[in-house]
C-alpha cells in the first residue's frame, strides 16, 4: 500500500483504539494499536515492554472490520505500518509484529530474521530449522529437559555478525500448544496454569519449569539442524 492509503486508514482508526502498547523487540519499538482485549493481553504477556519515552519504529493496527476479508493484511514499507483485519489467531499477529521488527533491523542495521528455534548447549548455539509441522518447537522443548541446554527462542530470532554469528532472542515468553504436556510430561504444570485460546495455544513463562537462568538473550551459533518430515528422504540421520 502507498502512504496516502496508509494515512486514510489511520484517520479511520482513532475511535476504535482502546489499547496502545509498545513492545521492545530486540531494541525495535513496535507499537500495537487495537480494540481487541485478547490481542492486547497476549501482546503484553508475549513481549518485553518498551519505555514510553521511546518513539515507535513500526506500528501494527489490529481490529475486526466487515468491509475486509478474513485475515487481511495491508502494509506500508516506507512507514513500517501494518493493518490487520479479522484475525482470530494470535500466532499470525505476533509473527507479523516480528516481521515488522525484522524489516527495521535488516534495512537499517544489517540484522536478519530467522524463523526457527535456537538453543544453547554448553555455550554453543544451535539453530533448529524446518517447515511448519516438522517439529521445531517439539524438539526444542524436548532438549530443554536436559540441564545443560538453554533456550534463546522457540520460533523466531535475530542474527548478526560475519565470521561468528550471534543469535538474539525476540520474545519474553513463548506461545505453546496445549498438547506439549502429552509429548513431554515435564511441562504438565505449565499447561495446567495456562489460559489457552480457541486455537489451543497460550503464552506461557517457561521459567516456571526450567528456571530463569536457562532462558538466554543470545548465543554464538555453531550448528544448524534441519528437520524434514519425509520418510522417503535418503539423508535421514534418525528415523
Indicate where each model-derived feature is located.
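A noncatalytic interaction/capping subdomain that flanks phosphate/NTP-handling catalytic cores
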Residues: 4-127, 146-147, 158-239
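Glycine-rich phosphate-binding P-loop
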Residues: 123-146, 151
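Flexible phosphate/Mg2+-sensing switch loops adjacent to catalytic phosphate-binding sites
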Residues: 151-157
Amino acid at each position: 500500500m502507498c502512504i496516502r492509503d496508509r494515512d486514510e486508514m489511520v484517520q479511520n482508526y482513532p475511535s476504535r483504539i482502546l489499547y496502545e502498547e509498545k513492545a521492545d523487540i530486540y531494541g525495535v519499538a513496535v507499537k500495537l494499536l487495537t480494540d481487541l482485549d485478547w490481542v492486547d493481553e497476549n501482546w503484553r504477556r508475549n513481549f518485553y515492554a518498551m519505555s514510553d519515552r521511546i518513539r515507535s519504529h513500526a506500528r501494527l493496527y489490529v481490529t475486526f472490520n466487515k468491509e475486509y476479508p478474513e485475515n487481511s493484511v495491508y502494509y506500508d514499507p516506507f512507514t513500517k505500518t501494518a493493518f490487520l483485519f479479522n484475525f482470530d489467531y494470535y500466532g499470525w499477529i505476533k509473527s507479523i509484529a516480528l516481521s515488522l521488527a525484522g524489516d527495521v533491523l535488516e534495512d537499517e542495521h544489517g540484522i536478519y530474521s530467522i524463523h526457527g528455534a535456537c538453543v544453547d548447549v554448553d555455550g554453543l548455539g544451535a539453530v533448529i530449522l524446518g517447515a511448519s509441522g516438522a517439529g521445531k518447537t517439539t524438539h526444542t522443548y524436548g532438549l530443554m529437559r536436559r540441564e545443560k541446554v538453554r533456550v534463546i527462542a522457540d520460533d523466531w530470532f535475530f542474527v548478526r555478525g560475519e565470521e561468528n554469528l550471534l543469535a538474539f532472542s525476540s520474545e519474553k515468553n513463548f506461545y505453546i500448544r496445549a498438547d506439549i504436556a502429552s509429548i513431554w510430561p515435564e511441562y504438565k504444570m505449565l499447561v495446567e496454569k495456562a489460559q489457552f485460546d480457541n486455537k489451543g495455544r497460550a503464552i506461557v513463562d517457561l521459567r516456571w519449569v526450567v528456571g530463569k537462568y536457562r532462558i538466554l538473550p543470545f548465543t554464538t551459533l555453531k550448528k544448524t539442524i534441519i528437520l524434514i518430515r519425509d520418510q522417503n528422504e535418503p539423508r535421514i540421520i534418525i528415523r
